[in-house]
From Swiss-Prot:
GO BP, sorted A to Z: protein folding
Pfam short name (any one): GrpE
Subunit-structure text: Homodimer.
Name of the protein this chain belongs to: Protein GrpE
NCBIfam families documented for this protein: PRK14139.1, PRK14140.1, PRK14150.1, PRK14151.1
Subcellular location, principal: cytoplasm
Name of the gene encoding the protein in the UniProt record: grpE
Free-text function comment from the UniProt entry: Participates actively in the response to hyperosmotic and heat shock by preventing the aggregation of stress-denatured proteins, in association with DnaK and GrpE. It is the nucleotide exchange factor for DnaK and may function as a thermosensor. Unfolded proteins bind initially to DnaJ; upon interaction with the DnaJ-bound protein, DnaK hydrolyzes its bound ATP, resulting in the formation of a stable complex. GrpE releases ADP from DnaK; ATP binding to DnaK triggers the release of the substrate protein, thus completing the reaction cycle.
SUPFAM superfamilies from the UniProt entry: Coiled-coil domain of nucleotide exchange factor GrpE, Head domain of nucleotide exchange factor GrpE
Keyword Cell membrane: no
Length: 187
């Protein structure tokens, strides 16, 4: 009888241990799932933080790159005036030669300074017309060049760091229209 009681006690102990083992296994599984979820969330937060940091760096870079845009745009009429003054003055007139040389030097210094800040002129004379960089002011028939070629530049365009600041104002070629026969030729 004592053996039976021992066997019953052992069976009960084994059943209790098995129940406790199942409970512990379930508990470990739940904790592992929670740990995996926490690690996943941690990785997502780190990735989001990295994306925010990268966007902020790009915004600062763009701000630095294009901070001069308004200022450079305000300087363009001054460059145009200096160039127009040189175009309208005669290089052979001795009475204005010192003034002309001063304007040329000033313009060169101005252009060199603007180049250092990535402001570049667009002078498309003889190039194919591009609506992205040019503004057609007129069309002119020409048999000498391909249609859609820039014949004349009224005003240079400018770009800052590759971004268009002002389009070049141009005259664009078009194919000559066929000659209409005169009344005498028709008869």
């Amino acid at each position: 009888m004592a053996d039976e009681q021992n066997l019953d006690a052992q069976a009960q102990d084994q059943a209790a241990e098995a129940g406790a083992g199942d409970e512990l296994t379930t508990r470990v599984q739940v904790l592992e799932e929670q740990l995996a979820a926490a690690q996943d969330q941690s990785l997502r937060v780190a990735a989001d933080l990295q994306n925010v940091r990268r966007r902020a760096e790009q915004d600062v870079e763009k701000a630095h790159k294009f901070a001069l845009e308004k200022f450079a745009g305000d300087l363009l009429p001054i460059i145009d005036s200096l160039e127009r003054g040189l175009d309208l003055s005669s290089p052979d007139d001795e009475s204005i030669r010192p003034m002309r040389e001063g304007i040329e030097l000033t313009l060169k210094m101005f252009q060199d300074t603007l180049k250092r800040y990535q402001l570049e002129a667009i002078d498309p004379h003889g190039q194919p017309f591009s609506a992205d960089q040019h503004q057609a002011m007129a069309m002119q028939e020409s048999a000498d060049v391909e249609p859609n070629t820039v014949l004349k530049v009224f005003q240079k365009g400018y770009q800052l760091n590759g971004r268009l600041l002002r389009p070049a104002m141009v005259v664009v070629s078009k194919a000559p229209s066929p000659a209409t026969p005169s009344i005498n030729e028709q008869a």
